Swiss-Prot record:
Organism: Mycolicibacterium vanbaalenii (strain DSM 7251 / JCM 13017 / BCRC 16820 / KCTC 9966 / NRRL B-24157 / PYR-1) (Mycobacterium vanbaalenii)
Reported function: NDH-1 shuttles electrons from NADH, via FMN and iron-sulfur (Fe-S) centers, to quinones in the respiratory chain. The immediate electron acceptor for the enzyme in this species is believed to be a menaquinone. Couples the redox reaction to proton translocation (for every two electrons transferred, four hydrogen ions are translocated across the cytoplasmic membrane), and thus conserves the redox energy in a proton gradient.
Protein name: NADH-quinone oxidoreductase subunit B
Pfam families in the record: Oxidored_q6
Required cofactor names: [4Fe-4S] cluster
Gene: nuoB
An annotated GO cellular component: respiratory chain complex I
């Protein structure tokens, strides 16, 4: 069944936001920020068995100025946090962040002064991917979920307000090291 059969009268109705979302999700260029063992699984995802290129991501960018997706794979030390933020700030809009692994998401088993307890304390995170380390299939699933999120993202002023709100929410979260609960 071709496109002609799906479109009544050959007319396609859509909005600019939906078309832009469709185009953006098919051409993500990730900037790798591999810091630990999760980076090995991220590299395996780019191999021939899992083939991330079928989602338009065949090129991992070494420079942040050409990337629009940052995959933070592994734990982030306190000394690496300013570098991570600088790389994020150098990325062009629109940009998205995927926290890959439990260490990037919440600090993992490294609950000490030297490790940031979650990348969301440094940059706003769009997708959290749990696991130690997460399998390549899980990374592909997270990328597909990010595609769904990109498809629904607003454009222009609405997007800028959504980004500011996400940044405020991320900065307002209580750091994990200060939380009280069963383990403290």
């Amino acid at each position: 069944m071709g496109l002609e059969e799906r479109l009544p009268g050959g007319i396609l109705l859509s909005t600019v936001e939906k078309v832009a979302g469709y185009v953006r999700k098919g051409s993500l260029w990730p900037a790798t920020f591999g810091l630990a063992c999760c980076a090995i699984e991220m590299m395996a995802t780019a191999g021939p068995r899992f083939d991330i290129s079928r989602f338009g991501m065949e090129r991992f960018s070494a420079t942040p100025r050409q990337a629009d997706l940052m995959i933070v794979a592994g734990r982030v030390s306190q000394k690496m946090a300013p570098v991570l933020r600088q790389i994020y700030d150098q990325m062009a809009e629109p940009k998205w962040v995927l926290a890959m692994g439990v260490c990037a998401s919440s600090g993992g088993m490294f609950n000490n002064y030297a490790v940031v307890q979650g990348v969301d304390h440094v940059v706003p995170v769009d997708i959290y991917l749990p696991g130690c380390p997460p399998r390549p299939e899980m990374l592909l699933h997270a990328i597909l979920k990010l595609h769904d999120k990109i498809q629904q993202m607003p454009l222009g002023v609405n997007r800028e307000e959504a980004i500011r709100e996400a940044e405020r929410a991320a900065l307002a979260v209580t750091p994990t090291i200060e939380l009280k609960g069963l383990l403290r």
